């Protein structure tokens, strides 16, 4: 078995070794948070593999929290949108978060955020100095992150082949995958792959809503496209997505529901994994206080600060006070509220090494917002979860966590101290959740090739072959009536109706002839 794996690894990676020289690769990250972290990891992996990588990113913005920065071995090109745009964009995004966390989220608020992203994209495309510099670099490949449509337009403007990385759930973007609606849940449906009759009805109807939303979201970039692309060469975003040579998906079937894929679609869930380091001594000392009881890790992601919502903050703090475990809570509070007494078993920190803590032998539970990177890290280390999904793909992610039985979720609007404490105790006391999380970890780790090897191997394959046309089905070039066999259906329907009409005519003629023959016989 080990010999087979070595042969498979050599056969997959050898073409990359045979490349005559390192490729020049541009990675583009226009938003921050977990999206930036994933693109940073991709850039570093490819740089370590021997390619010359340059990352283009926006210095700061509403998506860009303060991260603990590390020295980069790849080149970074940063730019800034005008100050007035940044201020207005931040207001829009803060309003989006406030409304969403308050249970008043609307699709129009998301469209407003996308409109600011489109305007930010226009500001960048107007930067002739940067665009000329990128063109002069003559990159071999561009790698885009898909939360924002702008990287697709930049790649198109540069005229270079590009690879897309989807950092969130599958269904949040339509890029040509088959969607059998009987068992592949549509994004936002909150369904599993096991649907009853009414579930399939809901899924079928929501598919049309999903398609309409995609059109509305893409339309926010219409003005940007008209401004920066000449008539006759203006890309259609839905078509531009299909031009990607490869699609890397930040997921794994240890977490996601099984579904059909295309040859140019590659799972790389677990890409964020790094060698485990000892946790900082102050955290180790805190963990040691609770002995065999262990500790609970709490973080609600990089874009949301729980301390900004006092009610959520108080309910969570009260829930943690009921636990015998210690609680390490990532909560960026410059000042702890004077009217709230911090639970004795809780330690709050502005920053923490999440992966290292998830790998700690004393961890008992992970309380998470349900972000894709966080869930994949928890699965890697076999840690069960309680999810408090906030927005975006997070509710869909927690549906999968619950379906796979390595965690439960609580709706934000129903978050109460008693409910949260009960859920946490349920997960820690019922060993089936831990067993399911460990089983998922085994699935994730037992691939013949690691996520890094898959990423590097497939990119080297595309670089060597000059593209991935051989991996793309002809359906991408077919008109919609051919894709769905409507022309065949109309032909067969016409043939059937024509045959029935002809049979009816012949039958009528036969009846007329028989009647005529009878009258002749009677006379």
From Swiss-Prot:
Coiled coil: none
E.C. number: 2.4.1.17
Transmembrane segments: 484-504
Membrane topology designation: Single-pass type I membrane protein
Alphabetical GO biological process terms: cellular response to genistein
EC main group: transferase
SUPFAM superfamilies: UDP-Glycosyltransferase/glycogen phosphorylase
Cellular component aspect of the GO annotation: UDP-N-acetylglucosamine transferase complex
CDD domains the record matches: GT1_Gtf-like
Primary location class: membrane
Chemical reaction(s) catalysed: glucuronate acceptor + UDP-alpha-D-glucuronate = acceptor beta-D-glucuronoside + UDP + H(+)
GO MF: glucuronosyltransferase activity; UDP-glycosyltransferase activity
UniProt KW keywords: Glycoprotein, Glycosyltransferase, Membrane, Signal, Transferase, Transmembrane, Transmembrane helix
Glycosylation sites (chain numbering): 52
Cytoplasmic compartment residues: 505-523
Membrane-side (Extracellular) residue stretches: 23-483
Family annotation (Gene3D superfamilies): Glycogen Phosphorylase B (3.40.50.2000)
Family of this protein: Belongs to the UDP-glycosyltransferase family.
Function per UniProt: UDP-glucuronosyltransferases catalyze phase II biotransformation reactions in which lipophilic substrates are conjugated with glucuronic acid to increase water solubility and enhance excretion. They are of major importance in the conjugation and subsequent elimination of potentially toxic xenobiotics and endogenous compounds.
PANTHER family per the UniProt record, alphabetical: EG:EG0003.4 PROTEIN-RELATED, UDP-GLUCURONOSYLTRANSFERASE 3A2
Name the record gives this protein: UDP-glucuronosyltransferase 3A2
């Amino acid at each position: 078995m080990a010999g087979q794996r070595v042969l498979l690894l050599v056969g997959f990676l050898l073409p990359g070794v045979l490349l005559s020289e390192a490729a020049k690769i541009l990675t583009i990250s226009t938003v921050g948070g977990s999206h930036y972290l994933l693109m940073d990891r991709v850039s570093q992996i490819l740089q370590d593999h021997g390619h010359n990588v340059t990352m283009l990113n926006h210095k700061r913005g509403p998506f860009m929290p303060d991260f603990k920065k590390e020295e980069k071995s790849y080149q970074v090109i940063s730019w800034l949108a005008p100050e007035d745009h940044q201020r207005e964009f931040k207001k829009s995004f803060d309003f989006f978060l406030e409304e969403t966390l308050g249970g008043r989220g609307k699709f129009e608020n998301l469209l407003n955020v996308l409109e600011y992203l489109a305007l930010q994209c226009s500001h960048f495309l107007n930067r002739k100095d940067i665009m000329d510099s990128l063109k002069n670099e003559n990159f071999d490949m561009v790698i885009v992150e898909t939360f924002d449509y702008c990287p697709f337009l930049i790649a198109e403007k540069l005229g270079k082949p590009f690879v897309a990385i989807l950092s969130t759930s599958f269904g949040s973007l339509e890029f040509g995958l088959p969607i059998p609606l009987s068992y592949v849940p549509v994004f936002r449906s909150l369904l599993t792959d096991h649907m009853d009759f009414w579930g399939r009805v809901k899924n079928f109807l929501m598919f049309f809503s999903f398609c309409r939303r995609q059109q509305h979201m893409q339309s926010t970039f219409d003005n940007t496209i008209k401004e920066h692309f000449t008539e006759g060469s203006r890309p259609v975003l839905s078509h531009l997505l299909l031009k990607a040579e490869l699609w890397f998906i930040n997921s794994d079937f240890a977490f996601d529901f099984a579904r059909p894929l295309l040859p140019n679609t590659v799972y790389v869930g677990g890409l964020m994994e790094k060698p485990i380091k000892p946790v900082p001594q102050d955290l180790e000392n805190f963990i040691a206080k609770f002995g065999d009881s262990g500790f609970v890790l709490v973080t609600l992601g990089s874009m949301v600060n729980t301390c900004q919502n006092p009610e959520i903050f108080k309910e969570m703090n009260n829930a943690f006070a009921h636990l015998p475990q210690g609680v390490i809570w990532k909560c960026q509070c410059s000042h702890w509220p004077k009217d709230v007494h911090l639970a004795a078993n809780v330690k709050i920190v502005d920053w923490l090494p999440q992966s290292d803590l998830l790998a700690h032998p004393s961890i008992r539970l992970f309380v998470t917002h349900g972000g894709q990177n966080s869930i994949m890290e928890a699965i890697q280390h076999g840690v069960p979860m309680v999810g408090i999904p906030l927005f975006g793909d997070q509710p869909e992610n927690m549906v999968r966590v619950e379906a796979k039985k390595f965690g439960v979720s609580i709706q934000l609007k129903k978050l109460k101290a008693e409910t949260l404490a009960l859920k946490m105790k349920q997960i820690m006391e019922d060993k089936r959740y831990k067993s399911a999380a460990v089983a998922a970890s085994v699935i994730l780790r037992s691939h013949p090739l690691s996520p890094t090897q898959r990423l590097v191997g497939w990119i080297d394959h595309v670089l060597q072959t000059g593209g991935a046309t051989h991996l793309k089905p002809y359906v991408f070039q077919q008109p919609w009536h051919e894709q769905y066999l409507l022309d065949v259906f109309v032909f067969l329907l016409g043939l059937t109706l024509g045959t029935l009409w002809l049979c009816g005519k012949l039958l009528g003629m036969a009846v007329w002839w028989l009647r005529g023959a009878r009258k002749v016989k009677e006379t």
